[in-house]
Amino acid sequence: MLRFTDEHEWLRLDGDVATVGITAHAAEQLGDLVFVELPKVGAKLTKGEAAAVVESVKAASDVYAPLSGEVTEVNEAAVADPASVGTDPQGGGWLYRLKLDDPSAMDELMDEAAYAAFAK
């Protein structure tokens, strides 16, 4: 299940763990990414809380926790090569994995069609 937020994050659910990243739209708006800061594994995040930072030559932008949960894994490759987040944001450029407190909360987020209309 793939869902999107109005802050331009995407989540892909596998069981009760969601992989989180920025959308292609957000990556396009930011331009070339030069720095990525990710949350610590084990961190408890609350929906709406700043969880990560992506920085481009244009601007630094917070990435917000789309839902509440615990960080189970971070993408160290994204830290080592921030440009990968911009070139493959919904693939190899994922940011972190979040064990959701309530996986059913995914239903509150936008599906791909709704996000496409929102991002226009």
UniProtKB/Swiss-Prot annotation:
Gene3D superfamilies: 2.40.50.100
Protein name as catalogued: Glycine cleavage system H protein
Gene Ontology terms: biological process: glycine decarboxylation via glycine cleavage system
Subunit: The glycine cleavage system is composed of four proteins: P, T, L and H.
Keywords: Lipoyl
Organism: Methylorubrum extorquens (strain CM4 / NCIMB 13688)
Family label: Belongs to the GcvH family.
Gene label: gcvH
CDD domains for this protein: GCS_H (cd06848)
Residues annotated with N6-lipoyllysine modification: 58
InterPro entries named among the record's database cross-references: 2-oxoA_DH_lipoyl-BS (IPR003016), Biotin_lipoyl (IPR000089), GCV_H (IPR002930), GCV_H/Fam206 (IPR033753), GCV_H_sub (IPR017453), Single_hybrid_motif (IPR011053)
Role played: The glycine cleavage system catalyzes the degradation of glycine. The H protein shuttles the methylamine group of glycine from the P protein to the T protein.
The record's free-text note on cofactor binding: Binds 1 lipoyl cofactor covalently.
Lineage: Bacteria, Pseudomonadati, Pseudomonadota, Alphaproteobacteria, Hyphomicrobiales
SUPFAM superfamilies: Single hybrid motif
Annotated ranges, domain Lipoyl-binding: 17-99
PANTHER family hit by this protein: GLYCINE CLEAVAGE SYSTEM H PROTEIN, GLYCINE CLEAVAGE SYSTEM H PROTEIN-RELATED
Assigned GO CC terms: cytoplasm; glycine cleavage complex
Pfam families linked to this entry: GCV_H
Cofactor: (R)-lipoate
